[in-house]
């Protein structure tokens, strides 16, 4: 199948947001296996994938609702839940190290208990479980914009399932256990083990409902922790290859290369929080996303300096909790960008 290179310009008079992707293919539509087939996408990475953006500020400001109203969008579906796209999520935020995180996750004293799948209509509040100023579950991640973008292409009878397993502060080169390179069968040493285990748990839960899960894509957002590492490209290729091989039995035709990989560049804008060290990661992401017209590797270009979406981070008053996290409108746009790649490349079954 041949990829088509497309680029969307940001014209505020015409569109609310734009998608600038490293490549934007148009493969043949995915086959409709039968009425038991449901599409599945796995979302993983670190805090901006886990969801570290306010939808409502601790001071009570309805940041996401206000953004929707400004853009003339209906807020009710994302507030009440999108029934055609269900999400189950697992992860934790650990500012003080892996050991503490693994023994004291935000929602329960047993992190393993949180690995029980719980698919719900996608809505606000599916971000980090951290409590800020006494307020809890006030965060969201890319799952929201993604779900709202593909909602009408799915159905309540055969909803798209999103499996989100992401860990704040994690990286390929971390030494405290929060490491994506290790393949130990030990949850205290390997994030890939946790990702693998949770993904299987969720796939089996779908099967128990009588549906047949078909894994269509692996969505990644990571690099803030180790974006300057010269081996970032190698680490990424290994991760994607291992993921595809691990879950090939759930791929279309059991072909691992039919599991799409959708990445995103990390922040490169100006300001005190500029992640200038992320150049190596962004170069790797763009290279992997652009190198072939025949694969299913994609990359959202979120950059400022490379003519991308120009997504902003770190403005607390605009929802960017802490230094490195997307502002509220930008976190939604990021999810929308993932969703548009899925739609533009026919990665969904006929509903």
Show where each model-derived region lies:
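Cell-envelope and extracellular/periplasmic
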Residues: 28-351
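Sec-dependent N-terminal signal peptides
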Residues: 8-16
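Bacterial signal peptide processing site
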Residues: 23-25
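C-terminal motif of bacterial Sec signal peptides marking the signal peptidase cleavage site
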Residues: 18-21
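Bacterial N-terminal signal peptides that target proteins for export
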Residues: 1-9
């Amino acid at each position: 199948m041949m990829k088509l290179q497309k680029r969307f310009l940001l014209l505020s008079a015409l569109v609310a947001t734009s998608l600038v992707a490293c490549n934007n293919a148009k493969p043949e539509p995915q086959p409709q296996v039968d009425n038991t087939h449901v599409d599945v996408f796995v979302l993983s990475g670190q805090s901006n994938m886990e969801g570290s953006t306010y939808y409502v500020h601790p001071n009570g400001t309805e940041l996401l609702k206000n953004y929707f109203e400004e853009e003339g969008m209906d807020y009710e579906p994302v507030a009440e839940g999108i029934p055609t796209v269900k999400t189950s999520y697992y992860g934790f935020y650990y500012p003080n190290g892996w050991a503490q995180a693994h023994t004291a996750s935000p929602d329960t004293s047993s992190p393993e208990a949180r690995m029980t799948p719980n698919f719900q209509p996608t809505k606000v509040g599916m971000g980090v479980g951290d409590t800020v100023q006494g307020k809890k579950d006030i965060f969201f991640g890319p799952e929201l914009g993604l779900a709202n973008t593909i909602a009408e292409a799915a159905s309540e009878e055969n909803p798209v399932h999103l499996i989100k397993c992401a860990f704040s502060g994690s990286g390929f080169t971390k030494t405290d256990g929060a490491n994506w390179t290790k393949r130990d069968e030990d949850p205290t040493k390997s994030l890939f083990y946790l990702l693998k285990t949770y993904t299987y748990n969720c796939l089996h839960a779908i099967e128990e409902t009588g549906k047949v899960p078909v894994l269509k894509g692996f969505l990644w957002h990571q690099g803030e922790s180790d974006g300057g590492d010269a081996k970032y490209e190698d680490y990424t290729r290994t991760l994607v290859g291992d993921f595809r091989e691990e879950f090939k039995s759930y791929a279309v035709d059991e072909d691992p290369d039919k599991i799409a990989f959708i990445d995103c560049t990390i922040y490169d804008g100006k300001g005190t929080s500029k992640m200038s060290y992320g150049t190596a990661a962004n170069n790797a992401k763009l290279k992997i996303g652009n190198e072939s017209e025949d694969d299913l590797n994609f990359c959202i270009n979120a950059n400022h300096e490379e003519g991308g979406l120009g997504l902003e981070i770190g403005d607390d008053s605009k929802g960017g909790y802490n230094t490195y996290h997307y502002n509220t409108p930008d976190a939604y746009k990021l999810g929308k960008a993932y969703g548009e790649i899925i739609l533009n490349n026919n990665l969904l079954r006929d509903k």
